[in-house]
Curated annotation (Swiss-Prot):
Task of the protein: Aspartyl-tRNA synthetase with relaxed tRNA specificity since it is able to aspartylate not only its cognate tRNA(Asp) but also tRNA(Asn). Reaction proceeds in two steps: L-aspartate is first activated by ATP to form Asp-AMP and then transferred to the acceptor end of tRNA(Asp/Asn).
A molecular function (GO) term: aspartate-tRNA(Asn) ligase activity
UniProt-listed Pfam families: GAD (PF02938), tRNA-synt_2 (PF00152), tRNA_anti-codon (PF01336)
Keyword ATP-binding tagged: yes
UniProt-recorded name of the protein: Aspartate--tRNA(Asp/Asn) ligase
Species assigned in the record: Ehrlichia ruminantium (strain Gardel)
Main location: cytoplasm
PROSITE patterns noted in UniProt: AA_TRNA_LIGASE_II
Entry GO terms, CC: cytoplasm
Chain segments carrying region Aspartate: 200-203
The EC number(s) this enzyme carries: 6.1.1.23
């Protein structure tokens, strides 16, 4: 191959025995047996066992003192291993290389991370020495998986007739809802670029430009706090937009793409049919707009059962406009009191006043703090609606609808985990559809967009003119897998009169819309096709495929939870000359 290697460290087999070879790589492990030292030499592709003996004292002394993770180039002769030492777990496990010469390319310092160890290290250590962390198989394999997934996505998109187009990184502030990263302009005094939260406007403009099917693996930047499924700062998405499409057309593109990717890169099962769940039903039955369908528990509304009942607390709540939601807990009726108390305390940590519960000991006996206030008909209705059998329990939460959904959803998730109800080794996809178009901001006492302001309202202009805004639905959709939102998307509003009307309900004048989104409104005056799109998150897809709990495990050089790059030392201060050049002044926080 070249002066550094004739073979890779995963290549040598019995057919290479007695050949002279050159290998290069990192000293992965050393085993000192007195007059013989065994070294596992590692490169990107695999491991080869090297043998150093004391017949050459110079070489032997070098390898004796050399630290792990030093980089070496060796020459040697391939030999068969003794049958008792064959390592079936290695591709090269039937051979070893007797070293005749060695060149130390670079010697390693004392390691802050043991590459060969399964030891857990703090995230700060791992990210500060990320170049070492990436040498570990598990982390490296996540990054390789990411590369393969992106390659497969590109092939699939091209096969479906999509064109890959790169959109600008330096742009103007966007309406996605998160905070922008701003870049001051040196030339245009007092003005700023923004890093794109998403290529939203550009991809819509591409449709107006006449492109039919667009995609890109798009970098996006949002000044958000970190979560397990969200990396602060930068993330990547498969950005897609199509002209002359309906919502179903988008689904018909994404579903086979997801099935292909998840089937190709995981041995887990995947549902071939993606159920469609309205936002209303998702919040009612699962307590989340990101329902985890691996959890079989289904929340039920039992408000009418408690209306005018003897249980005064719930009855009073109902008269004040609150609801009652029931969360089944199978096979828990005989659990100790501590089981039920722990769920009550959990609900309180969420902000709920508590939880009620009933245990159905057998077909005729119900116990618990609430049971004595309900007659047989009401108890039977609870059993029927919640699909309860003897030996099951039911928890109840009573709150205003939004809070009841939140609390019930969290309790459902907790019960699913504690009772080992979550179906393992499977991917459960679903679509969440029919999102509200508007929402009421209680703090600002105003109506605002629920999600994407550029989506088409269901019912069009007529709905905007004649319906209660809070009852209007949008052509918006999310694709969810195992409780994680993979992507949001929408059929876009391509008609200016509908756009102006929608924004006016949210408090924007026509002039404000034209000023804020002038490129889009100008373009829509010259023939805009119906269009829609979606943008599955690359990081989240790979996180699910790699089966890791944290999205930073599948990003090569991630920021930490505080939004810091510990490896490169950013964000960092800049000198006064640079500040002056950009006409900036740092105001100290008080």
């Amino acid at each position: 191959m070249n002066v550094y290697r004739t073979h890779l460290c995963n290549e040598l087999r019995e057919e290479h025995i007695d050949q002279t070879v050159t290998l290069s790589g990192w000293v992965y492990r050393k085993r000192d047996h007195g007059k013989i030292i065994f070294v596992d030499l590692r490169d990107h592709y695999g491991i080869t066992q090297l043998v150093f003996n004391d017949s050459d004292t110079t070489i032997f002394q070098l390898i004796t003192t050399l630290r792990l993770e030093s980089v070496i180039t060796i020459k040697g002769i391939v030999k068969a291993r003794d049958s008792s030492t064959i390592n079936e777990t290695l591709d090269t496990g039937s051979i070893e290389v007797i070293v005749s010469s060695i060149n130390i390319e670079t010697a390693s310092d004392i390691l802050p991370i043991n590459i060969a160890s399964m030891q857990d290290y703090s995230e700060d250590i791992r990210l500060t020495y990320r170049f070492l962390d990436l040498r570990r198989d598990k982390v490296k394999n996540n990054i390789i998986l990411r590369s393969k997934v992106i390659t497969e996505i590109r092939k699939s998109m091209e096969n479906m007739g999509f064109i890959e187009i790169q959109t600008p990184i330096l742009t103007s502030s966007s309406p996605e809802g998160a905070r922008d990263y701003l870049v001051p302009s040196r030339i245009h005094h007092g003005k700023f670029y923004a890093l794109p939260q998403a290529p939203q406007l550009f991809k819509q403009l591409l449709m107006v430009s006449g492109f039919d099917k667009y995609f890109q693996i798009a970098p996006c930047f949002r000044d958000e706090d970190a979560r397990a499924d969200r990396s602060p700062g930068e993330f990547y998405q498969l950005d897609i937009e199509m002209s002359f499409v309906t919502q179903e057309d988008i689904f018909n593109i994404i579903e086979p793409l997801m099935i292909n990717i998840f089937s190709k890169f995981s041995s887990k099962t995947i549902n071939k049919e993606f159920p469609k769940i309205s936002y209303h039903d998702a919040m009612l039955y699962y307590g989340s707009d990101k329902p985890d369908l691996r959890n079989p528990l289904v929340i039920q509304d039992v408000t009418e059962i408690f209306r005018d009942s003897e249980f005064k607390i719930f009855n009073s709540n109902i008269k004040q406009g609150m609801v009652v939601r029931a969360i089944p807990a199978p096979n828990t009726a005989h659990n100790p009191r501590s089981f039920f108390d722990s769920k009550i305390e959990f609900a309180k940590t969420l902000g709920a006043q508590g939880l009620g519960y009933i245990t159905f000991i057998d077909d005729s006996l119900a116990k618990g703090p609430i049971a004595k206030f309900l007659d047989k008909d009401r108890l039977d209705n609870i059993k029927l609606i919640c699909n309860i059998k003897a030996g099951d329990s039911v928890f109840f939460v009573s709150e205003i609808a939004d809070k009841a959904a939140l609390f019930a959803g969290e309790v459902r998730t907790l019960l699913g985990k504690e009772l080992n109800l979550i179906e393992e080794n499977t991917f459960k996809f679903c679509w969440v559809i029919d999102f509200p178009y508007f929402k009421y901001d209680h703090k600002e006492k105003s109506i605002n967009f629920f999600h994407n302001p550029f989506s088409m309202p269901q019912g069009g202009l007529e709905a905007l003119e004649n319906q209660d805004p809070l009852n209007i639905l949008a052509y918006q959709y999310d694709i969810v897998c195992n409780g994680i939102e993979i992507s949001s998307g929408a059929i876009r509003n391509h008609k200016l009169n509908i756009m102006y009307k929608a924004f006016s309900i949210a408090g924007y004048t026509k002039e404000m819309v034209d000023e804020k989104f002038k490129a889009l409104t100008r373009a829509f005056k010259f023939g805009a096709p119906p269009h829609g799109g979606i943008a599955p998150g690359i990081d989240r897809i790979v996180m699910l495929l790699a089966d890791v709990p944290n999205i930073r495990e599948v990003i090569c050089f991630p920021l930490n939870q505080s939004g810091e790059d510990l490896l490169m030392g950013s964000p960092s201060e800049i000198d006064n000359d640079h500040l002056k050049l950009l006409s900036l002044n740092i105001i100290k926080k008080t």
